[in-house]
């Protein structure tokens, strides 16, 4: 009965989105994926109530699962359309983009992931929510600065510098987010919690980020915008989604201490032998 209700809700949502956009394959694939994830969560409540409770009845975990995918939503979208942006707005060739953007992405992301993990651990020593503060600083603030600088700089070289800044900031969340999620569950279920965290990145960030940016850009072009202007405006508008992690990260940090300290206590109350 519950699975049927879940299917009905997802079908109604996807059918409405299909009618709005006309993209049958996009919403069919996303609907099937969402249904499978939803029914897995529902089945987990029957098979392993301890894991279900720690993962989905913890405010810190729920707010984290809401916040984290919004950062790669922007990242995946920008990765898909950055080449098009530089071709249309700065006249770069495919060779230039492949070389320069490839190097910027590799080096910036490396620095962001390693630096985010390092500073997240350091700040965690002083504040329980230290890793979440690092995610906010990099994934929201630095990302916003980098993105706006990249898309609105008239100079190609200045734009590439901001592109590098963006890649550093947008990669900061990876290690801190995974560690935050696994610290909210028992050791025996850390791989499952980490896998679900990565799944949310795919279902929201990868599946919807590039698609949304492309649809917005197409809508502007249909209104008479030049291709470069449409892409530039769309890349700016999509940053609105960062409002969600701006709020959710601080709500997660507010509940983090209580939820982390009570992990074993809540597990024992549900019959877990520790």
Where do the PLM segments sit?
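Intrinsic disorder in cytosolic terminal tails and internal cytosolic loops
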Residues: 125, 252-274
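C-terminal ends and interior cores of transmembrane alpha-helices
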Residues: 137-154
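Cytoplasmic membrane-interface "Motif A"-like loop-to-helix N-cap segments
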Residues: 121-138
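A membrane-interface helix-boundary motif in multi-pass transporters
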Residues: 17-28, 93, 128-133, 215-242
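Extracytoplasmic gate region of multi-pass secondary transporters
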Residues: 3-28, 59-116, 170-174, 178, ...
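Loop-to-transmembrane helix entry/capping segments in MFS-fold secondary transporters
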Residues: 94-99, 187-197, 231
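Symmetry-related core transmembrane helices of the 12-TM Major Facilitator Superfamily/SLC fold
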Residues: 6-8, 26-35, 137, 143, ...
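Hydrophobic core of transmembrane alpha-helices in multi-pass small-molecule transporters
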Residues: 69, 156-173
């Amino acid at each position: 009965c519950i699975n049927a209700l879940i299917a009905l809700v997802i079908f109604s949502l996807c059918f409405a989105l299909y009618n709005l956009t006309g993209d049958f394959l996009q919403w069919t694939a996303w609907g099937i994926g969402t249904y499978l994830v939803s029914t897995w969560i529902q089945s987990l409540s029957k098979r392993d109530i301890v894991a279900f409770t720690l993962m989905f009845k913890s405010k810190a975990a729920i707010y984290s699962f809401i916040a984290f995918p919004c950062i790669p939503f922007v990242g995946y979208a920008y990765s898909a359309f950055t080449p098009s942006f530089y071709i249309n707005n700065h006249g770069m060739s495919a060779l230039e983009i492949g070389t320069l953007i490839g190097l910027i992405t590799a080096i910036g992301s490396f620095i962001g992931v390693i630096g985010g993990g390092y500073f997240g651990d350091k700040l965690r020593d002083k504040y329980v929510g230290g890793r979440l503060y690092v995610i906010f600083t990099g994934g929201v603030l630095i990302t916003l600065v980098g993105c706006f600088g990249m898309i609105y700089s008239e100079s190609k070289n200045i734009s590439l510098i901001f592109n590098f800044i963006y890649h550093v900031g947008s990669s900061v969340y990876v290690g801190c987010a995974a560690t935050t999620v696994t610290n909210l569950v028992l050791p025996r279920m850390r791989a499952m919690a980490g896998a679900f965290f990565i799944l949310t990145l795919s279902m929201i960030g990868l599946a919807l980020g590039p698609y949304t940016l492309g649809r917005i850009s197409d809508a502007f072009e249909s209104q008479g915008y030049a291709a470069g202007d449409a892409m530039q405006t769309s890349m700016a508008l999509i940053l609105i989604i960062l409002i969600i992690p701006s709020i959710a990260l601080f709500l997660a940090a507010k509940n983090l201490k209580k939820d982390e300290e009570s992990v074993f206590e809540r597990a024992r109350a549900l019959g877990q032998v520790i």
